[in-house]
Curated annotation (Swiss-Prot):
It is a single-pass membrane protein. Ubiquitously expressed in normal tissues but down-regulated in primary carcinomas or in many cell lines derived from tumors. Highly expressed in white adipose tissue and in adipocytes. Expressed at lower levels in brown adipose tissue. Its EC number is 2.3.1.-, 3.1.1.32, 3.1.1.4. InterPro entries: H-rev107_PLA/AT, LRAT_dom. Disruption phenotype: Mice display resistance to diet-induced obesity: they show strongly reduced adipose tissue mass and triglyceride content but normal adipogenesis accompanied by higher energy expenditure and increased fatty acid oxidation in adipocytes. Mice show resistance to infection by picornaviruses, such as coxsackievirus A10, probably due to reduced viral genome release into the host cytoplasm. It catalyses: a 1,2-diacyl-sn-glycero-3-phosphocholine + H2O = a 1-acyl-sn-glycero-3-phosphocholine + a fatty acid + H(+); a 1,2-diacyl-sn-glycero-3-phosphocholine + H2O = a 2-acyl-sn-glycero-3-phosphocholine + a fatty acid + H(+); 1,2-dihexadecanoyl-sn-glycero-3-phosphocholine + H2O = 1-hexadecanoyl-sn-glycero-3-phosphocholine + hexadecanoate + H(+); 1,2-dihexadecanoyl-sn-glycero-3-phosphocholine + H2O = 2-hexadecanoyl-sn-glycero-3-phosphocholine + hexadecanoate + H(+). Interacts with PPP2R1A; this interaction might decrease PP2A activity. Changing Q129A: Abolishes enzyme activity. This is Phospholipase A and acyltransferase 3. The keyword Lyase does not apply.
């Protein structure tokens, strides 16, 4: 049996499981979250994430968590609490609220929704999704290079036998 989803508390990071990526928001109380809304998030939950890669601006929005999540599952995920000390709750909420309505720079690789919420909670902008994607691309590149090398060696070996 699945454990119940813990009720978010103000300052908690909320991880929302979109079909192709994870969207992040920060819970500010009374059912509301503040999050970066690039075009893929403005269009509604589950919209194609490719739109996020094609823009350099996002709007900071305050919306009900149930509307932001839509039909997608979500969880409280303060995953860096052991590595970083969260900022005081009043500072987290104040900083988040002050940004609502502002248009901010958005870059999928360096200034995305995960960077945004980690900066609010810990004062450290970081995205594990980006780091993991870069690792995966690197590993795939090494794998492709190794396959290419094996192909060249097999081809040479076959020519030598002829």
């Amino acid at each position: 049996m699945l454990a119940p989803i813990p009720e978010p508390k103000p300052g908690d990071l909320i991880e929302i499981f979109r079909p192709m990526y994870r969207h992040w928001a920060i819970y500010v109380g009374d059912g509301y979250v503040i999050h970066l809304a690039p075009p893929s998030e403005i269009a509604g939950a589950g919209a194609a994430s490719i739109m996020s890669a094609l823009t350099d601006k996002a709007i900071v929005k305050k919306e009900l968590l149930c509307h932001v999540a839509g039909k997608d599952k979500y969880q409280v995920n303060n995953k860096h609490d052991e590595e970083y000390t969260p900022l005081p709750l009043s500072k987290i909420i104040q900083r988040a609220e002050r940004l609502v309505g502002q248009e901010v720079l958005y870059r999928l690789t360096s200034e995305n929704c995960e960077h945004f919420v980690n900066e609010l909670r810990y004062g450290v902008p970081r995205s594990d999704q980006v780091r993991d994607a870069v690792k995966a691309v690197g590993i795939a590149g090494v794998g492709l290079a190794a396959l290419g090398l094996v192909g060249v060696m097999l081809s040479r070996n076959k020519k030598q036998k002829q």
